[in-house]
């Protein structure tokens, strides 16, 4: 079993820890808790780079090894890093579990060393009709991020 972890940091007071597990070549399970967010939906993505030298802005675009447009996690045409939305309660906290088959922890398309990013706004899943829908899901600014590392 492969395991990964990302500790989220933010200049806006958002904190969290995200865990990743994968059995063999199976799906990857993503689970975590994020706090300090406004209630509602927030876009949640794996970005291409594990670079936080300029905060979350230097994490690059969504992880997209197949060169597809943005979409929902269940869509055939989507970035590998498109994980949809997390739901934040009235207390500012989201606790979630997501399973996905396009974010392996091993192999040539591994997400280890890349970043996970929480966005300010809901991800429209590529269906919003906004000019940014098919690129970013029009999910707004990057409010927290962390580099995905291997966990023992």
From Swiss-Prot:
It catalyses: 2 superoxide + 2 H(+) = H2O2 + O2. Binds 1 copper ion per subunit. Binds 1 zinc ion per subunit. It holds the Pfam family Sod_Cu. Expressed in leaves (at protein level). The spatial localization is regulated by miR398-mediated silencing. Mostly present in flowers, old rosette leaves and inflorescence, and, to a lower extent, in cauline leaves, stems and roots. Induction: Upon photosynthetically active radiation (PAR) (e.g. light fluence) increase and UV-B treatment. Accumulates in response to ozone fumigation. Induced in response to oxidative stress, via a reduction of miR398-mediated silencing. Repressed by sucrose in a miR398-mediated silencing-dependent manner. Induced by salt stress. It comes from the Eukaryota. InterPro entries: SOD-like_Cu/Zn_dom_sf, SOD_Cu/Zn_/chaperone, SOD_Cu/Zn_BS, SOD_Cu_Zn_dom. This is Superoxide dismutase [Cu-Zn] 1.
């Amino acid at each position: 079993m492969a395991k990964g972890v990302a500790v989220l940091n933010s200049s806006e007071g958002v904190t969290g820890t995200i865990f990743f597990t994968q059995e063999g070549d199976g799906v990857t399970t993503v689970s975590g808790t994020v706090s300090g967010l406004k209630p509602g939906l927030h876009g949640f993505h794996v970005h291409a780079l594990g670079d936080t030298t300029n905060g979350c802005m230097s994490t690059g675009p969504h992880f997209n090894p197949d060169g597809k447009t943005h979409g929902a996690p269940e869509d055939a045409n989507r970035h590998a890093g498109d994980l949809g939305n997390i739901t934040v309660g009235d207390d500012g906290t989201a606790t979630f579990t997501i399973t996905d088959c396009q974010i392996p922890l091993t192999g040539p398309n591994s997400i280890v060393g890349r970043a996970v990013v929480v966005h300010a706004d809901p991800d429209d899943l590529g269906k919003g009709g906004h000019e940014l829908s098919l690129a970013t899901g029009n999910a707004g600014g990057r409010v927290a991020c962390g580099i995905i590392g291997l966990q023992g």
